[in-house]
């Protein structure tokens, strides 16, 4: 599961768990981005975001955290994340999971055509969200029917943008994210400067889920 995780919250965790259950995936790998290339705001230091992700996922033996994007350096592109994860798990079938609203702009991603050769795409959304992606569907004409699918996740009413805003204004973060992450945000005094609005964020993430036995 790749993304900024700034901060990670229950929406990310529930989305990963639900998709893993639906597609019978063996492992969920969370991949905090190094330097997100499409973010229009300053993100927290990569080490802070990495440690929050480790804290949030520690209690689930099915979850793990990878540093491939952080250690690579430079802007983080999904095509590179997929390439590196495939190199580490050559026998795994990869699932790339992202917010459904991000799929509308997927053709602006660097090397997006090759990404569909490396992974199946799953868009996660809040209940009732309708994805208008005719141009994406047309571009994918000729690929397998399951190359792209949608999954509704009720917990996506939670967003990283709102969590940052609440922290900036001293509002509680309890029950929006694991207790350890709440304590980390407080100890490190993260998000004390009011954040940019960030638009209508639903899930500040893209997701990579290797299914080692599903080849």
UniProtKB/Swiss-Prot annotation:
The family database entries (Gene3D superfamilies) matched by this protein are listed as:
HUPs (3.40.50.620)
Enzyme Commission code(s) on record? 2.7.7.18
- Catalytic reactions of this protein: nicotinate beta-D-ribonucleotide + ATP + H(+) = deamido-NAD(+) + diphosphate
Stored CDD domains: NMNAT (cd02165)
Q: Where is this region: Disordered?
A: 193-215
Q: Which GO terms describe its biological process?
A: NAD biosynthetic process
Matching entries from Pfam families are given as: CTP_transf_like
SUPFAM superfamilies, A to Z: Nucleotidylyl transferase
Q: What class of enzyme is it?
A: transferase
In its UniProt record, a GO molecular function of this protein is: ATP binding
Keywords, sorted A to Z: ATP-binding, NAD, Nucleotide-binding, Nucleotidyltransferase, Pyridine nucleotide biosynthesis, Transferase
Say which family it is in. Belongs to the NadD family.
| Protein name in the entry | Probable nicotinate-nucleotide adenylyltransferase
Which gene carries the instructions for this protein? nadD
């Amino acid at each position: 599961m790749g993304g900024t995780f700034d901060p990670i919250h229950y929406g990310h965790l529930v989305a990963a768990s639900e998709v893993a259950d639906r597609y019978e995936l063996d492992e969920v790998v969370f991949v905090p981005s190094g330097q997100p290339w499409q973010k229009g705001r300053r993100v927290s230091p990569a080490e802070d975001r990495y440690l929050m992700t480790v804290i949030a996922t520690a209690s689930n033996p099915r979850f793990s955290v990878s540093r491939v994007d952080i250690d690579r350096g430079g802007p983080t592109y999904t095509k590179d994340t997929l390439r590196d994860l495939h190199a580490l798990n050559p026998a795994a079938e990869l699932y790339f999971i992202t917010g459904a609203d991000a799929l509308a702009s997927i053709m602006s991603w660097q090397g997006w055509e090759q990404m569909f050769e490396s992974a199946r795409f799953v868009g996660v959304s809040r209940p009732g969200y309708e994805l208008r992606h005719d141009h994406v569907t047309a571009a994918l004409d000729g690929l397998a029917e399951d190359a792209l699918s949608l999954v509704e996740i009720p917990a996506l009413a939670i967003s990283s943008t709102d969590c940052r805003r609440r922290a900036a204004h001293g509002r509680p973060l309890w029950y929006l994210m694991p207790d350890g992450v709440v304590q980390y945000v407080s100890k490190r005094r993260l998000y004390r400067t009011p954040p940019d609005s960030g638009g209508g964020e639903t899930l500040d993430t893209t997701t990579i889920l290797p299914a080692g036995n599903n080849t």
